[in-house]
Amino acid sequence: MKFLHLADLHLGKRVNGFDMLEDQRFILEQILTLCDKHGAEAVVLAGDIYDTPVPPAAACTLLDWFLTQLATRKIPVLAVSGNHDSAERLDFASGLLAEQGVYIAGRFTGAPRQVVLHDRHGAIEFTLLPFVRAATVRHYLPDADITDYDSAVGAALAVCEPAAPRRVLVAHQMVVSGVCPPQLSGSETAPLTVGTVDSIDAARFAGFCYAALGHIHRAQRVGIDAVRYAGSPLCYHLDECGAQKSVTLVRIGKRGVEKIEPLPLTPRRAIRHLTGPLAKLVEHPTDTEDYIWATLTDPTPLPDAMAQLRAAYPNAMRLDYQPQGAAAQPADMTQAVRGKPFAELFQDFFTKMNGRPLTTEEVLAVKKLREEASKIE
């Protein structure tokens, strides 16, 4: 059997205010083409199907279209909820969908969902384990010895009687190999704790011939090739730009996994990072429809910099400053300003914009305005 392993679609996601739905539909169309080209006999969706628990209607319509396209092709779908999804909403109409070959495990209610498919060698069991927390597993399995995430997942899997000699796990969790954590990305906005009670050791999956994981946005193996994160099909952050996104084609033979092959994806628009003086960046623009994250090296901030940048690159997403010769600044300025008093922040901003510090009179005026504003708040 050949199946495609996908994860972390994050349908409905916005990146720096940009709606990514058109890009997501483009990449889903490409995935359907890969299904046809490689003769995929199933598609696995390992969680974070949506970006939020209450996704926009257009995102729901897009998922409906994608699932319908797969069902029309008679390609079974095996999906679990992720930490971004509403498990209850994903479970809606799951019984009816199963009759069309779309198997969705939204909530964990005491045991993973087991689905058996067949190929010419016999049965293959897909064990669908949605995103779970230790407290949830403890609620449904009160007699199990659950002390952390690792033991919780172990207890959840232990209740499953193997339904076939060849077994595939579909899960959405933080999985580590011993003390080696996976490589994270900036687009993973949920707090991820690595190497502590919040992670699961890949050794828990020894009874499966392949573990199809979601949660981490960089495609990678965890310890061994058969325990794998598919990664997100699109780049959603600066630190992912330049990375080759893919879906994973897995071939299960008579005795287990025979081949694991990443199939490269080409986005509608790439995310690119440009660095240099503004005048140089906009002088000879190329690939102007790409999403641009710009770091300007001009000595002082320019008031209309973003407008000039978007005149050359309409999809410019973000702009940061790092004057030539200055120490590198974090891309996320939240960390840089956290804990600084208001007066210092305003002084820094004024100096950058005007090339001089505030005078004593101006400092007093700002302080007075701040006090008056605080009374209004």
Regions found by a protein language model. Give the residues of each.
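N-terminal active-site segment of His-dependent metallophosphoesterases
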Residues: 1-68, 72, 363, 368-372, ...
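Active-site neighborhood of phospho(di)ester-bond hydrolases with catalytic His/Asp-centered motifs
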Residues: 6-7, 43-48, 76-83, 103-108, ...
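Metal-dependent catalytic neighborhoods of phosphoester/phosphodiester hydrolases
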Residues: 14-16, 49-66, 81-101, 106, ...
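Accessory, non-catalytic peripheral segments of nucleic-acid enzymes
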Residues: 37, 42, 251-377
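Active-site neighborhood of divalent metal-dependent phosphoester/pyrophosphate hydrolases
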Residues: 40-58, 74-88, 174-196
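Conserved catalytic scaffold of divalent metal-dependent phosphoesterases
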Residues: 92-194, 233, 253
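Binuclear metal-dependent phosphoesterase catalytic core
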Residues: 112-125, 129, 227-290
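Conserved beta-sheet core of the metallophosphoesterase superfamily
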Residues: 177, 181-258
